[in-house]
Amino acid sequence: MMLKKFATAAGAFAAVTLSATASYAQATTIPGEQVGLAVGAPLPEGIYAIDTFIYRRNDTRFSTDTAINVPVLVWSTGYKFLGANIQPLLAQPTVFGFPNNPAGVPNRDFSVNVGTLVGSIFAWDLGNGLGVSYLAAVHLNDLDAGRGLPQFSSNTYRQGFAASYTADGWNLTANLTHNFYDSPGRFEGAVGRAIGPLYLADALLLDLTATKKFGKFEIGAVAYGVTDLPLGGRNFARASAQGYTRAGRFAVGGLIGYDFGPFTAQLMVARDVAVRTRGTESTDGFIRLIAPLYSAPKAAAVEPVALMRKY
């Protein structure tokens, strides 16, 4: 990967991780990115736009505030594979950094494009409001140059397993996401040669949702967490020499949503209740908009035909 004009800012980027925990946390998927969504339930046939904006404030003094915008397009095709509704998706996350340096040190805001996510959800309707889904996707990190975070030195492969209960206005969803990498990854160019190979730990993320709709309103609780999976043997020693420490966090919060008709809005606030590194707790605020761009026309009702006609 070519660092290009961002090469000089690689040190600043390396200090900001998507999971907002200890340095070199390895999750490319944003923790909490999918809370509030019934990911396990098949979508009605159509095309949907979902935009999630997250602002994260860390308790560490002089730490950089981060904001993440995740726009997603999902096409619920109506086609089946092994009984599952096929739902291709495309996303282009962007991370923004807002430094809070001590007096005398200039602050310089920046943004980083995360690798484009392409993949598909396969969702099964089990009946009685129950649904399960499997996500297979990849963040094409090598296609987006100019970034200095170790997570982006290789493609991120992503799979997800979700279950949802959506009857009677409920959204009870558990979603487990696994990130794994082309490890060791590396950046190209002179800076990449100087840094050398980067040894990346896989990551697990859990998103939990429990909400209820009351008319057009939706109210409930959300929780989410992320942890690195252990690196083995030599890879752990090599990663530790590069500054890697295991990272993880778990946050709990609330959700309120409203159906405006053409689109639905959700607001969420969550706070870390457990972190691997004490003093790195964060508070997250979420804004999400969900809009159907196209809905398949409903089949016309068939009028009954008399068995006998009288002439």
Predicted features, each with a name:
Residues 19-25:
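Sec/Tat signal peptide C-region and signal peptidase I cleavage site
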Residues 33-35, 47-49, 67-73, 114-119, ...:
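Hydrophobic, lipid-facing positions within transmembrane beta-strands of outer-membrane proteins
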Residues 47-49, 84-90, 132-136, 165, ...:
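Transmembrane beta-strands of outer-membrane beta-barrel proteins
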Residues 38-46, 77-87, 125-133, 166-170, ...:
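Short loop/turn motifs that connect adjacent beta-strands in outer-membrane beta-barrel proteins
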Residues 54-56, 91-95, 137-141, 177-181, ...:
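Outer-membrane beta-barrel pore domains and translocons
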Residues 29, 33, 54, 186, ...:
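Outer membrane beta-barrel transmembrane domains
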Residues 40, 74-78, 121-123, 160-166, ...:
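Transmembrane beta-barrel domains of outer membrane proteins
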Residues 94-199, 243-246, 259, 311:
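Outer-membrane pore/translocation modules
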